[in-house]
Swiss-Prot record:
Pfam families: Intron_maturas2 (PF01348), MatK_N (PF01824). This is Maturase K. It comes from Acer platanoides (Norway maple). Usually encoded in the trnK tRNA gene intron. Probably assists in splicing its own and other chloroplast group II introns. Its main location: plastid. The gene is matK. Coiled coil: none annotated. It comes from the Eukaryota.
Length: 512
């Protein structure tokens, strides 16, 4: 364990002392302890906040608040303990946004230094979601078992404050973070943001993402440490994860949790092949190990969450799947391995014989049932998949309705272009096409037959030919190549976020 301590100690020169305590001085402590702040109401101009979240603007806002306390106290304040009033959402939002911008600075600098040290190419393709699936195809085809993991969230806000304390030795920032979490933060909204009206989940996405990423970053640092110490091959992409304060103490806690058998049990995991992929709160751990060893990893993860993060995680949140029998639901695709038998005729001297060669492939398909469920939620069809009209768009122009439906089809086709089977995608396009027709018919108070007869049968053919038309523009001199790519699998490296209908969190697709 001594060599681990030497390896994991944080260099004093890399500790970052934040600049904003010098700017805010005693105002941060006033925010955290002076309840007279709760009675201040400052009229703020309306507008966006992205261009107003600098440290200077936040300092001015806090200064005005601090001075306003001593000038006016409203006796009719019905809730003196509530910092955020009905008209102060922009006020608190601005402070939290400025806090998020400032605390992100040292971590972004650390990432840039790590990329420069590793001499990695800063390509935008690395940010594409679709780049994960070629990685699956190249590395998962020879593996056997997969751990499908849902990362649990901490229930108590103080856990995030403690996690943040491992990174930054700055009391004022901890006071401010604790104030945000305890005074006006609805913690249930962080756990289930899609069902919440909390301003942090809906109007402060930067602050929400910072807290969430800090939690996941802490979890993955310990996980990669265990993985690297249990493997013959060391990971080359987890270098910055080891820059931790008191990391040696964490390892000692893990040793106590695992009944002082840390070194005795790690030999069970020694295998050079293990891959880890995560997007948001879902991760995939693939290995060539047998089910017994995968159960060991499941045991270690559950105990890590329970004893270090104080999060009770049911074992059902971690599923052990066979790569060639079960599907992996990840990023809106159902993925699994498949064995294809290829018969080859060979001849040796005068005797001819057949050889059956089994070729391993990794296929990805479109999950039709979840997509229809998303279309049902968005009011494009009913629960049986029958298209219905979109009454909320009835007041819009015909060109707007058609353009809106075509953008949805284009986005779905673009996102699911890597599917091995396109028939499910054709059904989704059919639902949207008929829903578009019914929406126009509802607007004009006509019938489907009369409407299509008036516009022609080729009116909605673009719903099926849009993606092929795009590929024909990319390959203008090879029409056969563009059609083959349209029917085949294409991974686009310009997709940096998951599709809204696939993500099941939003009801509308935002036009590009």
């Amino acid at each position: 364990m001594k060599e681990y301590q030497i390896h994991l100690e944080l260099d004093r020169s890399q500790q970052h002392n934040f600049l904003y305590p010098l700017l805010f001085r005693e105002y941060i402590y006033a925010l955290a302890h002076d309840h007279g702040l709760n009675r201040s109401t400052i009229p703020l101009e309306n507008g966006g906040y992205d261009n107003k979240s600098s440290s200077l603007s936040v300092k001015r806002l806090i200064s005005r608040t601090y001075q306003r306390i001593h000038l006016s106290i409203y006796a009719k304040d019905s809730n003196p303990n509530q910092f955020i009033g009905h008209n102060n959402k922009f006020y608190s939002q601005m402070i939290s946004e400025g806090f998020s911008v400032i605390v992100e600075i040292p971590f972004s600098l650390r990432l840039v230094a790590f990329l420069e040290g590793k001499e990695m190419a800063k390509s935008q393709n690395f940010q594409s979601i679709h780049s994960i699936f070629p990685f699956f195809e190249n590395n998962f085809s020879h593996l056997h078992y997969v751990l499908d993991v849902l990362i649990p969230y901490p229930i108590r806000p103080e856990i995030l404050v403690r996690t943040f304390r491992y990174w930054v030795k700055d009391a004022s920032s901890l006071h401010l973070l604790r104030f945000f979490l305890h005074e006006y933060f609805n913690w249930n909204s962080l756990i289930t943001p899609k069902k919440s009206n909390s301003i942090f989940s809906t109007r402060n996405p930067r602050f929400f993402l910072f807290l969430y990423n800090s939690h996941v970053y802490e979890y993955e640092s310990i996980f990669f440490f265990l993985r690297n110490q249990s493997s013959h091959l060391r990971s080359t992409s987890s270098g910055p994860l080891f820059e931790r304060i008191s990391f040696y103490g964490k390892v000692e806690d893990l040793v106590q949790v695992f009944v002082n058998d840390f070194q005795d049990n790690l030999w069970l995991f020694k295998h050079p092949i293990m891959h880890y992929v995560r997007y948001q709160g879902k991760s995939v751990l693939a290995s060539k190990d047998m089910p017994l060893l995968m159960n060991k990893w499941k045991y270690y993860l559950v105990n890590l969450w329970q004893w270090h993060f104080h999060v009770w995680s049911q074992p059902g949140r971690i599923h052990i799947n066979h790569l060639y029998k079960d599907y992996i639901d990840f990023l809106g695709y159902l993925s699994r391995g498949r064995l294809n038998t290829l018969v080859v005729r060979s001849q040796m001297l005068e005797n001819a014989f057949l050889i059956d060669n089994a070729m391993k492939q990794f296929e990805t398909t479109v999950p039709i049932i979840p997509l229809i469920g998303s279309l049902t939620t968005a009011r494009f069809c009913n629960s049986l998949g029958h298209p219905i009209s979109k009454p909320t768009w009835a007041d819009s122009s015909d060109s707007y309705i058609i353009d809106r439906f075509m953008r949805i089809c284009r986005n779905l086709s673009h996102y699911h272009s890597g599917s091995s089977k396109k028939k499910s995608l054709y059904r989704i396009k059919y639902i949207l096409r008929v829903s578009c027709v019914k929406s126009l018919v509802r607007k004009h108070k006509s019938t489907v037959r009369v409407f299509l007869k008036r516009l022609g049968s080729e009116f909605l053919e673009e719903f099926f030919t849009e993606e092929e038309h795009v590929l024909s523009l990319i390959f203008p001199r090879a029409l056969f190549t563009s059609r083959r790519l349209y029917r085949g699998r294409v991974w686009y490296l310009d997709i940096i976020c998951i599709n809204d209908l696939v993500n099941h969190d939003k009801l509308e697709i935002v036009p590009n």
